[in-house]
Amino acid sequence: MSEYSLFTSESVSEGHPDKIADQISDAVLDAIIAEDKHARVACETLVKTGVAIVAGEITTSAWIDLEELVRKVIVDIGYDSSDVGYDGHTCGIINIIGKQSVDINQGVDRAKPEDQGAGDQGLMFGYASDETEVLMPAPICFSHRLVERQTEARKSGLLPWLRPDAKSQVTCRYENGKVVGIDAVVLSTQHNPEITQADLHEAVMELIIKHTLPAELLHKDTQFHINPTGKFVIGGPVGDCGLTGRKIIVDSYGGMARHGGGAFSGKDPSKVDRSAAYAGRYVAKNIVAAGLAERCEIQVSYAIGVAQPTSISINTFGTGKIGDDRIVQLVREHFDLRPYAITHMLDLLHPMYRPTAAYGHFGRTPVEMTVGNDSFTAFTWERTDKAEALRSDAGL
């Protein structure tokens, strides 16, 4: 990454208002997919003081108790009392969901499933880098870990005065494309009014920041900004309106890679905004894991109603062991990037999506899950099971 000597990424906790909205949208998707794997779901959520509004287009044979589902998500996150300003038990729930347009539906559904067309036009990117063990850029990786730790400290009772809303930001220093230090750390966390700023600063520094970030990357000149505006009691949907799909850079690569603009949460796998972005990560990660490149970015694009991608492009930023054109050939040979094939390849028709809606969709560990009678693996796009075959066919 020689073009930058410093690079900064941010993340937000599950209690951030935009992430509340994402989690509600994905919880709705999960509940529907659990009953109807052929459903078409595009679910959008808005949260603000005293209310959650759920909208979108959904075509399904399933029935879900939307109000109960939305309340459960909000309470699970930690907004369970008027004391914190937003209470999932009592807030208003407004449902304005409609059905998917028949004009869109006729372009997606096909007699043969493998001919399923893309749910929309668009461009999607996937990325991987060898700078961390999960093959993700370090700034976004560290930013996610900070807010994950904030939530862990809050929910475990280690720091019971924490509240759900939090943001993090990490600036990494690079030399010759490798991370050599962390130059700045920002962590803003909502808290109860009785905690002093001095006690908060000490606890956050010792039990969140130093507990999470590699000590060898922190140095005497590292800047630490903990709640830099001071008091942060009012947060969540009281402080800011939250919307589904407004944290697309947090959800992906922290700005290190390009982004096609489409959000993920609330969309079933027929929407290539989501499924093709997951496939792009799967492709890029396997290319880096195979040793074909130190960094890899893939772009794919689609036309609505058309199964085959309209383009597949690769950029290894000069780190490739073989040419980028040859890598594109290998991608076409080893990965079927038609929408139905992606869904099959990554086994996406399971209620696996709510866990993706906080702390990043990428750089996660594949995990076995069971929902009802359905057992499956989540985060399948993080597997590197194609790496050996790619390396062999590349002649490395």
UniProtKB/Swiss-Prot annotation:
The lineage of its organism: Bacteria, Pseudomonadati, Pseudomonadota, Gammaproteobacteria, Pseudomonadales. SUPFAM superfamilies: S-adenosylmethionine synthetase. ATP binds at H16, D165, A166, K167, K231, F232, D240, R246, K247, A263, K267. L-methionine binds at E57, Q100, D240, K271. Binds 2 divalent ions per subunit. Coiled coil: none annotated. PROSITE patterns: ADOMET_SYNTHASE_1, ADOMET_SYNTHASE_2. It comes from Azotobacter vinelandii (strain DJ / ATCC BAA-1303). This is S-adenosylmethionine synthase. Catalyzes the formation of S-adenosylmethionine (AdoMet) from methionine and ATP. The overall synthetic reaction is composed of two sequential steps, AdoMet formation and the subsequent tripolyphosphate hydrolysis which occurs prior to release of AdoMet from the enzyme. Keywords: ATP-binding, Cytoplasm, Magnesium, Metal-binding, Nucleotide-binding, One-carbon metabolism, Potassium, Transferase.
